[in-house]
Swiss-Prot record:
Keywords: Cytoplasm, NAD, NADP, Oxidoreductase. GO terms for cellular component: cytoplasm. This is Glyoxylate/hydroxypyruvate reductase A. Its main location: cytoplasm. InterPro entries: D-isomer_DH_NAD-bd (IPR006140), GhrA_Enterobacterales (IPR023514), NAD(P)-bd_dom_sf (IPR036291). It is an enzyme of class 1 (oxidoreductase). GO terms for molecular function: glyoxylate reductase (NADPH) activity; hydroxypyruvate reductase (NADH) activity; hydroxypyruvate reductase (NADPH) activity; NAD binding. The active site is at R227, H275 (proton donor). It catalyses: glycolate + NADP(+) = glyoxylate + NADPH + H(+); (R)-glycerate + NAD(+) = 3-hydroxypyruvate + NADH + H(+); (R)-glycerate + NADP(+) = 3-hydroxypyruvate + NADPH + H(+). It comes from the Bacteria. PANTHER family: 2-HACID_DH_C DOMAIN-CONTAINING PROTEIN (PTHR43333), D-ISOMER SPECIFIC 2-HYDROXYACID DEHYDROGENASE NAD-BINDING DOMAIN-CONTAINING PROTEIN (PTHR43333:SF1). It holds the Pfam family 2-Hacid_dh_C. It is found in: Cytoplasm. It comes from Enterobacter sp. (strain 638).
Length: 312
């Protein structure tokens, strides 16, 4: 069994050694330009077209939760990865716990008004503020897939009203479920904290815009943990400036790294991290990939295959 590996920033020797240990007998090599030798499987992140084109692969694994970089290239180069070759993605592999940590810590930061106290500190002003009430602090999760369900699970013990919205209906204990475009307004109405965990598809690009933000509760909060293209940043800034939004926590941006001239850097109501909310944990990812390859070699069903029409 031959496996080719390509990731522009990962520790390639670690991955090759770990995969070799997890799949005895497998020959794992780093793909470099000009390598047209046989391969059964490809593990990739933002792969060049020539890496996959013309190969009779058994499967391709995207080394992250998103596959938009591959699917966007397929629009221009459909021969890069024919339909009969399955494409898999990493839905969790440690990312779920990281998303839980990020979301819970930020929700509590806002709920306890630490953002307001930090602003008062900048003015050297001492003033105890009125507490927020849990029943008025409804949390809405856009995207109810694996990561969305993990975030809802972590928030449940804190007693906030929880709701989720997705393309097709998902049901989780203690979470009010909304689905489809017709139910989006009802989901947004009264939502105080909006957490975005949507996949990046043609339908979700620009979904968080002026029209959507205006349907949230007054003085609401936005946490974007999915993709920067989901948010129209000009509309976000307008909502912050008018007070419709009280704050935003952003991990992803329309352009990364975020340009130094972006007004997001200096906005007092915007907190930011550099796309680190959930990163691939190598050991867990290797275990999942090895297990999936073993299932495929044995003719068994494998989970987390991407539906190319849906984009996830």
């Amino acid at each position: 069994m031959d496996i080719i590996f390509y990731h522009p920033t990962f520790d390639t020797p670690y991955w090759i050694n770990a995969l070799t240990a997890a799949l005895p007998g497998a020959r794992v090599r780093e793909w470099k330009r000009g390598d047209n030798e046989h391969a059964d499987y490809a593990l990739v992140w933002h792969p060049p077209v020539e890496m996959l084109q013309g190969r009779d692969l058994k499967a391709v694994f995207a080394l992250g939760a998103g596959v938009d970089s591959i699917l966007s290239k397929l629009k221009a180069h459909p021969e890069m990865l024919p339909e009969h070759i399955p494409l898999f993605r990493l839905e969790d592999t440690g990312m779920g716990q990281q998303m839980q940590e990020y979301a819970v810590s930020q929700v509590l930061h806002w709920f306890r008004r630490f953002d307001d106290y930090q602003a008062l500190k900048q003015k050297s002003h001492w003033e105890p503020l009125a507490d927020y009430q849990r029943e008025d602090f409804t949390i809405g999760i856009l995207g109810a897939g694996v990561l969305g369900s993990k975030v809802a699970e972590a928030l449940a013990p804190w007693g906030f009203p929880l709701r989720c919205w997705s393309r097709s209906r998902k049901t989780y204990p203690g979470v009010q479920s909304f689905a489809g475009a017709d139910e989006l307004p009802a989901f947004l109405k009264g939502t105080r904290v909006l957490i975005n965990l949507l996949p990046n598809t043609a339908e979700t690009v620009g979904i968080i815009n002026k029209g959507l933000l205006n349907q949230l509760a007054d003085e609401s909060y936005l946490m974007n943990l999915a993709r920067g293209v989901h948010v129209i940043e000009e509309d976000l800034i307008d909502a912050l400036n008018t007070g419709k939004l009280k704050g935003a926590m952003l991990d992803v941006y329309s352009s990364e790294p975020l340009p130094v001239e972006s007004p997001l850097w200096a906005h007092p109501r915007v907190a930011m991290t550099p796309h680190i909310a959930a990163v691939t944990r190598p050991a867990e990812a290797v275990a999942y990939i090895a297990r999936t390859i073993e299932h495929l070699e044995q003719g068994k069903a494998a989970t987390r295959q991407v539906n190319r029409q849906l984009g996830y």
